[in-house]
Amino acid sequence: MKHLLIALRVTLVFTLITGAAYPLIVTGLAKGLFRHQADGSLIQAGGHTVGSEWIGQNFTKPGYFHGRPSAAGNDGYDGLSSGGSNLGPTNQKLADRTAADIRKFRAENPTFTGSVPPDAVTASGSGLDPHISPETAEAQVARVAGARGMSQEAVRQLVAANTAGRQFGFLGEARVNVLQLNLALDQAAPGRR
């Protein structure tokens, strides 16, 4: 009986430490030091929350930049079903889907004649990547500019202003947050989408 009481006390103490004290301390530190990130890196526009810096959204209108394809959930961009397709490089389903995505990308961007950037036709590991490469953004400039009645140079300037370089100067690649870029487009050309 003595060992059982000791085990129960240890369980209770560690439950309080790891289940209450530690989460409260870490949450308090996060809210105090990194409030924006601790609250989900939410993006506001027009007094409303329109998304998060870290969760991709499905933009389909011609006047918006389109993000990467999503394998999260049945219809994509399902935050509750985050994950990749897990299809290997020799899987015929992946080859067929990629070929279909290339045809779709070319149909949406008929003036683009270069090689389709890989991130324009492949889903990320999470299926919810909010970024595209500057090359993928450049491939969409003509379509977006035409749909918005803007010059391509004005759209390119918005892309450049919303392009982040490598993290710490050497990690990863340059990237464009699609939601932030599309919000900048809405500010530059309101009513034209």
Swiss-Prot record:
Annotated TM spans: 10-30
Superkingdom per UniProt: Bacteria
Entry keywords, A to Z: ATP-binding, Cell inner membrane, Cell membrane, Ion transport, Membrane, Nucleotide-binding, Potassium, Potassium transport, Transmembrane, Transmembrane helix, Transport
Subcellular location: Cell inner membrane
GO annotations of cellular component type: plasma membrane
Topological category with respect to the lipid bilayer: Single-pass membrane protein
InterPro entries the record matches: KdpC
GO molecular function: ATP binding; P-type potassium transmembrane transporter activity
Subunit structure: The system is composed of three essential subunits: KdpA, KdpB and KdpC.
HAMAP family: KdpC (MF_00276)
Family: Belongs to the KdpC family.
PANTHER family named among the record's database cross-references: POTASSIUM-TRANSPORTING ATPASE C CHAIN, POTASSIUM-TRANSPORTING ATPASE KDPC SUBUNIT
Function: Part of the high-affinity ATP-driven potassium transport (or Kdp) system, which catalyzes the hydrolysis of ATP coupled with the electrogenic transport of potassium into the cytoplasm. This subunit acts as a catalytic chaperone that increases the ATP-binding affinity of the ATP-hydrolyzing subunit KdpB by the formation of a transient KdpB/KdpC/ATP ternary complex.
Protein name: Potassium-transporting ATPase KdpC subunit
